[in-house]
Amino acid sequence: MLLLIFGKDSRLKYFLGALIAVAVILFIINIVDLNRYVVRSVAIYDSKIKKRLKVCFVSDLHNYACTPKFYEDIREYAPDVILCGGDTLTATKGRKQDRAYAFLKELSKIAPVYSALGNHEYRAMIYPEVYGSLYDEFLSKVKEYGINLLSDDSVYFEENNIKVTGINIDRYFYKRFKVFKMEDGYIESLAGKLEEDKYNVLLAHNPDYFEYYNAYGSDLILSGHVHGGLIRLPLLQG
């Protein structure tokens, strides 16, 4: 129950009213953002890149039914490879994942697909007693559609001198409202020793640990998880 008690001071009343109005507006904006996508094009130049590679990065579809325009936009971009940041599934016991698999199938028709795991796939993998055969089913579809899974694994595009690595940080690091300390060498234990002569791309689902990914030395870090980005609040560190 929410109980608001107003006294004679109308300033408090106006302040609380304004606060509620701002909260409602932010909530509406959040709902809208969660149900749309924005296409951003970024050009990266680096002396280690031998030849241009057009990459499309998508993440956190969560068993969503994509519109034809979504796929048209990707086809129009004509990527050489497609990178997935994870959470193609929504790990809910007994829930059908048909739309997630349709998404992977359509992507595989456009370009070679390389996918990391998100926390939902990772959860399905480590808790089969909860999610049953969900992860095995996911692996079966990945194999059927020729998706390349980067689960603490890498792929090297020799012609471009670009190495892409996907890592799975422990479930412990996905606890809400808390960022934990990672031990020295933890990212290297997942990704392997950094090859500094290559252009290194790291697929790391949770962006909260950017400082650790960056310390590892990757040239480019691609994350998902936060569904619309992070907002830094001044003075509050949140």
Can you describe what each PLM-predicted range is?
Residues 125-146, 154, 158-200, 210-211:
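Binuclear metal-dependent hydrolase catalytic cores centered on His/Asp/Glu-rich metal-binding motifs
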Residues 62, 88-89, 120-121, 154-155, ...:
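Catalytic metal-binding/acid-base residues of hydrolase active sites
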Residues 53, 80-81, 162-163, 199-201, ...:
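Structural motif
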Residues 51-148:
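Membrane-embedded segments
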Residues 1-49:
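N-terminal membrane-anchoring alpha-helices
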Residues 150-153, 204:
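Short loop/edge segments at beta-strand edges and connector loops
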Residues 27, 35-46, 188-212, 216-217:
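Extended recognition/assembly regions associated with phosphoester-bond processing machinery
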Residues 144, 201, 206-238:
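Conserved beta-sheet core of the metallophosphoesterase superfamily
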